[in-house]
From Swiss-Prot:
The modification N6-acetyllysine is found at residue 40. It comes from Bos taurus (Bovine). SMART domains: Tubulin, Tubulin_C. The modification Phosphoserine is found at residue 439. The modification 3'-nitrotyrosine is found at residues 282, 452. Dimer of alpha and beta chains. A typical microtubule is a hollow water-filled tube with an outer diameter of 25 nm and an inner diameter of 15 nM. Alpha-beta heterodimers associate head-to-tail to form protofilaments running lengthwise along the microtubule wall with the beta-tubulin subunit facing the microtubule plus end conferring a structural polarity. Microtubules usually have 13 protofilaments but different protofilament numbers can be found in some organisms and specialized cells. This is Tubulin alpha-1D chain. GO terms for molecular function: GTP binding; hydrolase activity; metal ion binding; structural constituent of cytoskeleton. Mg(2+) binds at residue 71. The gene is TUBA1D.
């Protein structure tokens, strides 16, 4: 078996975890108490969903997941919520005081008290696996736990499970909707620390999701529940190939092989279509061509950036539902002729396609319409460097005045860590710039200066 263990860190990670597991249960027909009427093999079996769920002798399905937060309130909602019987109590790990939006608390002071317990719980989950393929880690960049504790965990996982792949789903701080002033600090510190430990990181920009909810679903003031359900759909499309049998079954390492040309350039852009409310879906025929075309609209991306200004290094289209290869090939051919999709000159302009015949499921009472087919596009493009540039700029504005730095130093960090992290980010921006340069002509030219 190729099992995956999901780790949900901090408030954002836990709440997205709720949305994801709720959706997985609906997709696989698993009840909130873990029973699965359709599953005839008791205690194990070799079904595809066993990558995400383990089975007990009593026929109960338990998610291979750990929820961690340094303070209890958010996880208490899981402990008392609809799916409280689904999880093993030891899978829900809480500390007593939170990281207070401070990376240093999550990574050094508070985090170190909880890390061994978390790793022990992960080890127990890993022991139940016959062939663990890797970890999916859900967290935000901006929070103290999401940034600090995650980076600590990633470092330790690299030590304990060196060769296993680690994929991140990271919530990028939204420019408009900020929950903390120090988000740029936390984001840059965590990115710097986890850069060498993460194999592939799907960024989700809260603001982009807000806009999609407002524009496509006509929700005037989207709540986190609205956002998380949409994020859940995207995560579900990405992981569907691991949980169902499909024509092209992607395992975790295959994501990296197809999307990551260089180890540091591992931030694919996710785009999902169709995001549409029930009232509209009733009147629209969402063909393969239409939803494929929608994937190339910047409006449907999970991160605010413009791929029309960047170059693509790789592109995967993951379809689910009523889709046949013939339609897909036709849709891609049309897009290649119509759209100005620029690939880097050292990369073949191939689109990798995966098709899963399981149609998309929606949460009852949710905002999304039940559709026959959906597509999730994962593309590695140089345009995502815009997101780093925005963050770096905000970091610079605060760091120039050393604003709020004393909170970090007081928890045992050194100021040098800030400048080191910032230099690493500058190098990352430079890497993206160089990757997008043309290989032959680019040799003789002088490098143009940084845009700061």
């Amino acid at each position: 078996m190729r099992e995956c263990i999901s780790v949900h860190v901090g408030q954002a990670g836990v709440q997205i975890g709720n949305a994801c597991w709720e959706l997985y249960c609906l997709e696989h027909g698993i009840q909130p108490d873990g029973q699965m009427p359709s599953d005839k093999t008791i205690g194990g079996g070799d079904d595809s969903f066993n990558t995400f769920f383990s089975e007990t002798g009593a026929g109960k399905h338990v998610p291979r997941a750990v929820f961690v937060d340094l303070e209890p309130t958010v996880i208490d909602e899981v402990r008392t919520g609809t799916y409280r019987q689904l999880f093993h109590p030891e899978q829900l790990i809480t500390g007593k005081e939170d990281a207070a939006n401070n990376y240093a608390r999550g990574h050094y002071t508070i985090g170190k008290e909880l890390i061994d317990l978390v790793l022990d719980r992960i080890r127990k989950l890993a022991d139940q696996c016959t062939g663990l393929q890797g970890f999916l880690i859900f967290h935000s960049f901006g929070g103290g736990t999401g940034s600090g504790f995650t980076s600590l965990l990633m470092e330790r996982l690299s030590v304990d499970y060196g060769k296993k792949s680690k994929l991140e789903f990271s919530i990028y701080p939204a420019p408009q909707v900020s929950t903390a002033v120090v988000e740029p600090y936390n984001s840059i510190l965590t990115t710097h620390t986890t850069l060498e430990h993460s194999d592939c990181a799907f960024m989700v920009d809260n603001e982009a999701i807000y806009d999609i909810c407002r524009r496509n679903l006509d929700i005037e003031r989207p709540t986190y529940t609205n956002l998380n359900r949409l994020i859940g759909q995207i995560v579900s499309s990405i992981t569907a190939s691991l949980r169902f049998d499909g024509a092209l079954n992607v395992d975790l390492t295959e994501f990296q092989t197809n999307l990551v040309p260089y180890p540091r350039i591992h931030f694919p852009l996710a785009t999902y279509a169709p995001v549409i409310s029930a009232e509209k879906a009733y009147h629209e025929q969402l063909s393969v061509a239409e939803i494929t075309n929608a994937c190339f609209e910047p409006a449907n991306q999970m991160v605010k950036c413009d791929p029309r200004h960047g170059k693509y290094m790789a592109c995967c289209l993951l379809y689910r539902g009523d889709v046949v290869p013939k339609d897909v090939n036709a849709a891609i051919a049309t897009i290649k002729t119509k759209r100005t999709i620029q690939f880097v000159d050292w990369c073949p302009t191939g689109f990798k396609v995966g098709i899963n015949y399981q149609p998309p499921t929606v949460v009852p009472g949710g905002d999304l319409a039940k559709v026959q087919r959906a597509v999730c596009m994962l593309s590695n493009t140089t345009a995502i460097a815009e997101a780093w540039a925005r963050l770096d700029h905000k970091f610079d504005l605060m760091y120039a005045k050393r604003a709020f730095v004393h909170w970090y130093v007081g928890e045992g960090m050194e100021e040098g860590e800030f400048s080191e992290a910032r230099e690493d980010m500058a190098a990352l921006e430079k890497d993206y710039e160089e990757v997008g340069m043309d290989s032959v002509e680019g040799e003789g030219e002088e490098e143009e200066g940084d845009e700061y």
